[in-house]
């Protein structure tokens, strides 16, 4: 296995997304491709709490072809396309409870030459400092939809423990009523790869 450690067990993801999101900070996100392996330490996440969360795709238990995977077991990969960018989420909680955590930013680790080739002409800080940027840099695509985050080619291992974690409102959800103010965005305080 090309990553630096074993994938975290499925039990790690079997908790509400607001508990999982801060725990993912510092973990190592690994993507294996034919070109090689790219990895980055997760430094920013957002929790989406499902049926009661107006900002969640699954608000009101809305079940569509796109959101179907959110209703499956924890640890499934939920990718979707927004403004031509693929965004990556990890399903949390349990079967029938459609919660997920969006991976918003990562600090490049392994395979930086791959990231540079996938994000040419960009400063290294710009490779992975946003949810669409990090998927492009790491080679994460819609082909990863529905896979398990506990096994290659896309998985998460232990990384580092952040010294400080900050919280605040999620980004880009202005039309979601009171949910836009929930402090469900988490980031490693002071990390230069955080999106904003």
Swiss-Prot record:
Give the Enzyme Commission number. Answer: 3.2.2.-
Molecular function as annotated in GO: alkylbase DNA N-glycosylase activity; DNA binding
Task: Reply yes or no: does the keyword Transferase apply.
Answer: no
Write down the top EC class of this protein: hydrolase
**Record keywords:** DNA damage, DNA repair, Hydrolase
Give one GO biological process term: base-excision repair
Q: Does the keyword Hydrolase apply?
A: yes
InterPro entries with a match to the protein in the record: Formyl_transferase-like_C_sf, MPG, MPG_sf
- One Pfam family from the record: Pur_DNA_glyco
PANTHER family assigned to the protein according to its UniProt record, in alphabetical order: DNA-3-METHYLADENINE GLYCOSYLASE (PTHR10429:SF0)
The Swiss-Prot or TrEMBL record describes its family as follows: Belongs to the DNA glycosylase MPG family.
Q: What is this protein called?
A: Putative 3-methyladenine DNA glycosylase
Upper classification of the source organism reads: Bacteria, Bacillati, Bacillota, Bacilli, Bacillales
